[in-house]
């Protein structure tokens, strides 16, 4: 889970944020109750009380809908920088862990990963739309931190992101939020060490 997705908009269709939210919530609830495979467009429409055509006008299919429902769990609420990099990295770690540990995310992510294995182009588009804004936010955080001597000026931002995402995702899928505070502090400490390491090293 990274940045929040938004409903895909068709040409000429006015946005209806309330309907979008209704459908995304229904999708999350079905993922928790029935699992990824059983969460179909028809089932979501029934639960949300809308017709399937309303969903297809916003999302091209189930996978796109589930992606947006999962990304909506963190709603792009990137932590507000505190001025202390270690504190900020801890906040980022907690955000990633709790979003990925949400029951809907734990239900959806294995199914999505299986589909991405067979469709690398869709996964690449997802990365561009979902992860790039988060990487940019991290880059801005680390740039400011470097100016105050808390990070290396040329630290590897994408490596930090991959470490953050991979560690929290695996932990969330296998342990949920068990011992979350201790885990988050250990990961934040490791991220802090990476941030202080120049790429040239």
Summary of predicted features, one role per range:
Residues 1-34, 38-47, 53, 64:
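Basic, helix-initiating cap at the start of DNA-binding domains
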Residues 38, 61-66, 76, 89, ...:
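Short amphipathic alpha-helical segment with a characteristic S/N-K-E followed by hydrophobic residues
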Residues 41, 70-77:
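Short, basic, alpha-helical segments at the C-terminal edge of helix-turn-helix-like DNA-binding modules
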Residues 64-70, 100-128:
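Amphipathic alpha-helical segments used for helix-helix packing
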Residues 77-109, 160:
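Hydrophobic alpha-helical connector segments
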Residues 107, 120-147:
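Amphipathic alpha-helical packing segments from all-alpha helical-bundle domains
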Residues 143, 152-174, 184-191:
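Hydrophobic alpha-helical segments that form the core
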């Amino acid at each position: 889970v990274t940045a929040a997705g938004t409903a895909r908009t068709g040409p000429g269709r006015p946005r209806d944020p309330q309907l979008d939210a209704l459908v995304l919530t229904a999708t999350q609830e079905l993922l928790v109750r029935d699992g990824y495979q059983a969460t179909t467009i028809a089932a979501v429409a029934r639960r949300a009380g809308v017709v399937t055509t309303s969903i297809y006008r916003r999302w091209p299919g189930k996978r796109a809908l589930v992606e947006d429902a999962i990304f909506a769990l963190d709603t792009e609420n990137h932590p507000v920088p505190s001025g202390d990099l270690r504190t900020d990295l801890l906040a980022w770690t907690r955000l990633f862990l709790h979003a990925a540990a949400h029951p809907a995310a734990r239900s959806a992510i294995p199914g999505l990963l299986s589909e991405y294995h067979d469709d690398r182009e869709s996964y690449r588009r997802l990365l561009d739309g979902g992860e790039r804004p988060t990487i940019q936010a991290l880059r801005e955080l680390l740039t400011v931190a470097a100016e105050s001597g808390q990070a290396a000026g040329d630290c590897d931002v994408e490596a930090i992101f991959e470490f953050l995402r991979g560690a929290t995702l695996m932990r969330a899928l296998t342990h949920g939020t068990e011992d979350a505070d201790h885990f988050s502090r250990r990961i934040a400490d490791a991220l802090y060490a990476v941030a202080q390491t120049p790429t040239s090293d």
